[in-house]
């Protein structure tokens, strides 16, 4: 596909794409075309500098981003060079490196919380929370020279970052988290497992200790291109430095204003480290500020948040990062303060319907963004109760996929731990084995299940219970040994009662491997399944998107609702917690990311009260000049359920629709509504009731208690 750099890139982009050798840093703001810049840089090196694609390495963070980048680059290269293109996530590159260098016998496990569950049984810490702490620590502070973690103080700091104030007040919690790390690493080693952080650690350790290996790989890649550089953690930076050590040609694209992953090890001064390590000159820094995604009115709001960030950081020449757009309309972003959480739900639901019905916006092109996952549940319940807006249903899919992988992992490792998980999933695990394993830690389940007569320490009754489990396990082993993969899948699917959609995905993955590599192993199959999960999480169905702001990074939508912009929620803060400047800047950057996901419509929402207590809007709202930059949707703190409310041509006084006193309702009350008809109260909250209407067309709806149209009835 022909692409003319001189006409199809703007001046800023063109200067970056055609820069010379050495280390070049491109500060590319939200929606300014990062993927375009990297793909065009790749094509420029091939077409103008005659660099073979096999000698260029492009690194990014997600499979989705890598896939999009690869597609763009392949369109710009002759077909005969397609097989030579090297575009990877950090993890997939490390997986390739380890396998090429003889490190083949490992299983990547992205759900290792079970190792911690027993250990933390007596603690109030959750295993997933400890895993976050461990992952951030490993990614940030591994010392390759000593092959050890650098200091306990950093682990304690990460505990401070992730734990609630009540947890942080007790030294016991910190000690538990540190001890859990030791237990976690021991469990992985005993079961021949590695996590994604280990891929990076093993790769960097090998490169740092084997100079011939380092020379081989650093000579191979003449140019290295990096995406989203602001999210780089210490270990990823060390890998980039080593790979670039011979040619020292780096082209790194990122945006410091979108650095939102400090909690998982991203280093805030990584750009400064890069400049110092490679002696980067000012002429090798490029700023890309023309946005191709958002309406200018949305960018005006986003720039006001950037201005706040720059002021708090005392940045000189701070306007360099401000974005501008050629997309202009008379449509302002909207701020709405609902009277309650239920009112917020109602307003969002009605607005989604209005955008879909009257403006032709598909549900898949709208997103509700949340600061945390816990905010999502009540909104999901409200959407389910309404029933008219399609929702993404992915939880069951991924749970079934994880269960299937547990069975396959057991067939590779043959460890007691994995066999137990697999047989429990297959519902053939005899409970008597729990006691047997505790009494005799030398028990080898693999041998017992394949040769029951050797289980002399078990009585006849116990051996009888094992028979069914043994039949299942030995049959699975036979499938693996004889490489009957289709039979293995069919048998496992039937035993697990796997949904057809999950089966189809797994079969497609198997067929892909069979086409690409006839000598693939079951380990390759498992790892490929793990690597492809990111792609599945981006459903193509026409459903509304409910995601956290962190998950929304890199995405864009026609309409965006930012949920719950209230004090203590955004910025996120626990009771009695004091937010320091660095934490506030992290939250401001996250808010900026949320704002810049919207292309046309942006809605900022907060609530007036929750559980009977008045709560204040986030100070982030105050950082925006509302009179000039926001349309204020309402100030009367009432739940608006009328479709007409969203039509600016209507001038009715909505305050007249509400009584001055709340009506007392209890569950089971019979009620009547002027529009929806007869119904029964099924839930009562502070200022609203949920009514199940007899007319199935209306289903269950939340209505403010003192709405004039809602009255008690006897019938």
UniProtKB/Swiss-Prot annotation:
PROSITE patterns in the cross-refs: UVRD_HELICASE_ATP_BIND, UVRD_HELICASE_CTER
GO cellular component: cytosol; DNA helicase complex
Catalytic activity: Couples ATP hydrolysis with the unwinding of duplex DNA by translocating in the 3'-5' direction; ATP + H2O = ADP + phosphate + H(+)
Keyword Hydrolase in annotation: yes
Keywords assigned by UniProt, alphabetized: ATP-binding, DNA damage, DNA repair, DNA replication, DNA-binding, Helicase, Hydrolase, Isomerase, Nucleotide-binding
E.C. no: 5.6.2.4
Gene Ontology MF annotations: 3'-5' DNA helicase activity; ATP binding; ATP hydrolysis activity; DNA binding
Domain UvrD-like helicase C-terminal: 296-554
Entry's family note: Belongs to the helicase family. UvrD subfamily.
Name this protein carries in UniProt: Probable DNA helicase II homolog
Organism in which the protein naturally occurs: Mycoplasma pneumoniae (strain ATCC 29342 / M129 / Subtype 1) (Mycoplasmoides pneumoniae)
């Amino acid at each position: 596909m022909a692409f003319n750099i001189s006409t199809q890139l703007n001046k800023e982009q063109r200067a970056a794409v055609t820069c010379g050798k050495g280390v070049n840093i491109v500060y590319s703001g939200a929606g300014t075309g990062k993927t375009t810049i990297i793909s065009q840089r790749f094509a420029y090196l091939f077409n103008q500098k005659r660099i073979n694609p096999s000698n260029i390495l492009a690194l990014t963070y997600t499979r989705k981003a890598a896939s999009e980048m690869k597609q763009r680059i392949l369109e710009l290269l002759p077909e005969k060079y397609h097989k030579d293109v090297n575009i990877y996530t950090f993890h997939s590159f490390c997986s390739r490196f380890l396998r090429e260098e003889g490190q083949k016998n490992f299983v990547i496990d992205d759900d290792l919380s079970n190792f911690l569950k027993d250990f933390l049984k007596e603690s109030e810490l959750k295993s997933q929370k400890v895993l976050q702490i461990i992952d951030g620590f490993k990614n940030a502070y591994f010392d390759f020279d000593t092959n050890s973690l650098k200091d306990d103080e950093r682990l304690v700091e990460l505990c401070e970052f992730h734990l609630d104030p009540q947890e942080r007040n007790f030294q016991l919690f910190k000690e538990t988290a540190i001890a859990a790390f030791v237990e976690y690493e021991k469990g992985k080693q005993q079961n021949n497992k590695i996590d994604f952080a280990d891929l990076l650690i093993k790769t960097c350790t090998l490169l740092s200790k084997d100079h011939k290996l380092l020379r081989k790989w650093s000579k191979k890649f003449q140019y290295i291109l990096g995406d989203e550089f602001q999210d780089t953690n210490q270990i990823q930076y060390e890998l980039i430095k080593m790979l670039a050590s011979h040619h020292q040609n780096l082209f790194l694209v990122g945006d410091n204003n979108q650095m939102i992953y400090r909690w998982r090890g991203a280093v805030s001064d990584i750009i400064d480290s890069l400049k110092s390590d490679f002696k980067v000159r000012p002429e090798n820094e490029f700023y890309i500020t023309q946005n191709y995604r958002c309406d200018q009115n949305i960018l005006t709001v986003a720039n006001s948040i950037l201005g706040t960030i720059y002021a708090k950081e005392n940045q000189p020449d701070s306007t360099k990062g401000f974005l501008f757009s050629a997309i202009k309309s008379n449509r302002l972003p909207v701020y709405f303060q609902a009277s309650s959480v239920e009112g917020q739900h109602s307003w969002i639901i009605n607005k989604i319907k209005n955008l879909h019905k009257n403006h032709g916006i598909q549900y898949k092109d709208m997103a509700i963004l949340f600061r945390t996952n816990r905010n999502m549940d009540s909104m999901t319940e409200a959407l389910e109760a309404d029933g008219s807006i399609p929702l993404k249903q992915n939880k069951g899919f991924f749970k079934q996929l994880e269960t299937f992988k547990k069975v396959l992992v057991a067939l590779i490792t043959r460890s007691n731990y994995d066999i137990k998980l697999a047989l429990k999933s297959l519902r053939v695990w005899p409970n008597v084995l729990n006691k047997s394993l505790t009494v005799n830690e030398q028990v080898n389940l693999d041998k017992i299940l394949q040769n029951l007569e050797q289980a002399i320490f078990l009585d006849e009754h116990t051996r009888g219970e094992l028979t069914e489990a043994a039949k299942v396990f030995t049959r699975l082993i036979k499938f693996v040994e004889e490489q009957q993969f289709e039979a293995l899948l069919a048998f496992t699917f039937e035993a697990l009662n796997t949904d057809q959609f999950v089966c189809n995905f797994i079969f497609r993955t198997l067929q892909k491997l069979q086409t690409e590599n006839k000598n693939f192993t079951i380990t390759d199959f498992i790892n490929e399944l793990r690597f492809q999960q990111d792609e599945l999480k981006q459903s193509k169905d026409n459903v509304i998107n409910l995601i956290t702001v962190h998950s929304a990074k890199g995405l864009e939508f026609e309409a965006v609702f930012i949920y719950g912009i209230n004090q203590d929620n955004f910025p996120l803060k626990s009771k009695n917690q004091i937010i320091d400047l660095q934490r506030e800047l992290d939250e401001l950057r996250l808010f900026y990311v949320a704002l810049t996901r919207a292309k046309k419509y942006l809605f900022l929402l907060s609530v007036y009260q929750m559980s009977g207590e008045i709560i204040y809007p986030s100070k982030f709202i105050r950082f925006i000049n509302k009179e000039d930059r926001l349309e204020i949707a309402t100030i009367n703190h009432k739940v608006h359920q009328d479709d007409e409310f969203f039509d600016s041509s209507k001038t009715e006084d909505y305050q007249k629709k509400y009584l001055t006193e709340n009506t007392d309702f209890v569950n089971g009350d019979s009620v009547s509504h002027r529009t929806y008809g007869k119904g029964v109260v099924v839930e009562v909250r502070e200022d609203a009731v949920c009514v199940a209407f007899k007319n199935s067309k209306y289903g269950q709806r939340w209505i403010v208690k003192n709405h004039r149209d809602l009255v008690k009835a006897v019938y």
